[in-house]
C-alpha cells in the first residue's frame, strides 16, 4: 500500500465514524430512544477536536516525507490549517446550533448540525488531498 492509501484509510475510517454520529444529535427521537448512541454522538465532538488539534498535524508530518528528505511544508501546512479551522469553525457552528431556542429553532439546529457534519467530511477530504499532493511529480 502506498503512502496516499495509508493516509486515506485512517482518514476515511474516522470520517465514517464521526460524521454520522454527530448527525444523530439533531434528532430528538434518537435522543429519547437511544441514549448510548447520543452519548457517542456527543463524544464524537471531543474525538473531532482531538483529531483536528493533534491528528492532522501528526499525520501531515509523518506522511509529508518525500524520499527520506525533510517533511513537506505543503502537507504540514494543510494539516495545520485543517486543525485550526476544524476546531474553531466547527466549535462555533456547533455552539450556535445547540443554543437556538427561538420558534423555528429545531430547523436552524438541524441545518447547523448538518453543516458541521459536512465540515468534518470536507476537512477529512482536505487531509487526504494534502497527503496526495507531495506524491505527485510533474511530467518531464
Residue spans for each PLM region:
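Transmembrane alpha-helix entry/boundary detector in multi-pass membrane proteins
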Residues: 4-8, 28-52, 110-120
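Alpha-helical transmembrane segments of multi-pass integral membrane proteins
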Residues: 9-22, 82-90, 124
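Juxtamembrane "helix-exit" motif on the non-cytosolic side of transmembrane helices
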Residues: 23-32, 93-104
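Canonical alpha-helical transmembrane segments
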Residues: 49-68
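C-terminal halves and exits of single transmembrane alpha-helices
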Residues: 75-102
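Alpha-helical membrane-associated segments of multi-pass integral membrane proteins
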Residues: 4-11, 99-140
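Haloarchaeal acidic low-complexity proteome signature biased toward cell-envelope/secretome components but also
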Residues: 1-20, 35, 65-78, 130-140
Amino acid at each position: 500500500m502506498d503512502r496516499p492509501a495509508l493516509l486515506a484509510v485512517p482518514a476515511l475510517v474516522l470520517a465514517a465514524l464521526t460524521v454520522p454520529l454527530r448527525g444523530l444529535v439533531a434528532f430528538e427521537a434518537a435522543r429519547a430512544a437511544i441514549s448510548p448512541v447520543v452519548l457517542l454522538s456527543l463524544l464524537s465532538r471531543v474525538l473531532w477536536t482531538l483529531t483536528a488539534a493533534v491528528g492532522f498535524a501528526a499525520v501531515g508530518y509523518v506522511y509529508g516525507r518525500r524520499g527520506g528528505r525533510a517533511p513537506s511544508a505543503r502537507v504540514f501546512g494543510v494539516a495545520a490549517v485543517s486543525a485550526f479551522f476544524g476546531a474553531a469553525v466547527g466549535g462555533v457552528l456547533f455552539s450556535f446550533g445547540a443554543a437556538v431556542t427561538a420558534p423555528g429553532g429545531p430547523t436552524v439546529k438541524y441545518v447547523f448540525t448538518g453543516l458541521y457534519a459536512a465540515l468534518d467530511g470536507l476537512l477529512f477530504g482536505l487531509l487526504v488531498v494534502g497527503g496526495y499532493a507531495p506524491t505527485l511529480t510533474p511530467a518531464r
